[in-house]
Curated annotation (Swiss-Prot):
Belongs to the bacterial ribosomal protein bL17 family. This is Large ribosomal subunit protein bL17. One of its GO terms (biological process) is translation. InterPro entries: Ribosomal_bL17, Ribosomal_bL17_CS, Ribosomal_bL17_sf. The keyword Transmembrane does not apply. PROSITE patterns: RIBOSOMAL_L17.
Length: 127
């Protein structure tokens, strides 16, 4: 029985899953919108939202926690210098998932996951 087991396995072992979501979280923070499968987008939301909440309070300890979870100084800098102040007045719900059809090869449901208040330069780059 799978009672009280949260999270999706996504046909990966735990280290592969952790590395995949670490990379996807970095891409989402860097580009502010990415396209992926719907189940991955729903799980990625559980990784990215706590990072942004952490970035709302700038301290050395929080920066070290964010680095431990992302392993990328560029991502940590963007989280604390841009995203933390941008979402300071928002109490959660920093991401939006938009369904965008099905993948041609295997008919997997696809989705865009984006930060809700994207900056203008990333909106122009996405179009």
């Amino acid at each position: 029985m799978r009672h009280r087991k949260s999270g999706r396995q996504l046909n990966r072992n735990s280290s592969h899953r952790q590395a995949m979501f670490r990379n996807m979280a970095g891409s989402l923070v860097r580009h502010e919108i990415i396209k992926t499968t719907l189940p991955k987008a729903k799980e990625l939301r559980r990784v990215v939202e706590p990072l942004i909440t952490l970035a709302k309070t700038d301290s050395v300890a929080n920066r070290r926690l964010a680095f431990a979870r992302t392993r990328d100084n560029e991502i940590v800098a963007k989280l604390f210098n841009e995203l933390g102040p941008r979402f300071a007045s928002r109490a959660g719900g920093y991401t939006r998932i938009l369904k965008c059809g099905f993948r041609a090869g295997d008919n997997a449901p696809m989705a865009y996951i984006e930060l809700v208040d994207r900056s203008e330069k990333t909106e122009a780059a996405a179009e």
